[in-house]
Amino acid sequence: MKIYLNYLVKVLITSPCSASVIIQYGIKSWPIWECEPSKFQWNYDDKEICLIIEGQAKISTQNGYIYVIKAGDLVEFPAGLNFEWEITKSIKKHYRLGG
């Protein structure tokens, strides 16, 4: 398991997310969001935790950091940050906002 943490933007990626974490947090019961390949800006008003089920995306921060997230990754985005999403392969994720 690899964990990537950037202290400037506080994005946490756990790759791959373990089955025990998925069960512990009830991730499979979270809502699902899907998107076809595209590029768009997104502002996180609330913290988001998501599990990428399918696909891949490149996420760029305002200060130039680029992350590639893919199926199996658990990603935590802090509130208050702006990102550019570039969906490179149709993506599907479970997500939870807040807390």
Language model features with spans:
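Short, conserved beta-strand element in jelly-roll/cupin
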Residues: 44-59
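Short histidine-centered beta-strand/loop micro-motifs
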Residues: 23, 40-44, 61, 67-68, ...
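Short acidic-glycine-tyrosine-enriched beta hairpin
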Residues: 63-79
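Double-stranded beta-helix
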Residues: 3-10, 29-31, 92-99
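Short hydrophobic/aromatic-rich beta-strand segments that constitute the beta-sheet cores
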Residues: 42, 59, 93-96
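Ligand-binding loop in jelly-roll beta-barrel domains
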Residues: 79-99
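Transition segment at domain starts
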Residues: 3-24
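Conserved short histidine dyad/triad with adjacent acidic residue
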Residues: 16-18, 26-45, 78-79
